[in-house]
């Protein structure tokens, strides 16, 4: 792995999140549909970095992107969160591969539909697909997608804030473009990258 995306200096101007899951669909003459998924779901991002001077952002960012050696290396990237959860959130009970409802405890607040979570036992990131608010005992049941790809044990830690995605670049050519100059004549750079989750 080749480090973490330099989020401290390279702020996102735009961030588009996509879900990638190859599905084969066949339709009969009568209109019936047969669908089969042929691999695991993974997330992808298209991110545009704020326009800035090389000394402010782009020197460090260019060096980081070069270290990735195209798509060879993996790195982590953290998108913003939506919910207002606090506490040390843990898995409550044992959950099998394929489960989509997970019991948790130690939580206060609400996980919002669209929030990302990650379990300590593996790198896959999951999306919460329905709001889940902790009850008076700090417990909740969350519904996630995709289904679990690795079983969970009781008291596994759930990461809900600053969830790191392990990703790789999906394009072999990375281009840093200039988009003009500021009022002092400093060249301004812009960069857009496409990444996909590494499972």
Language-model region placement:
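Extracellular/virion structural assembly segments
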Residues: 1-199
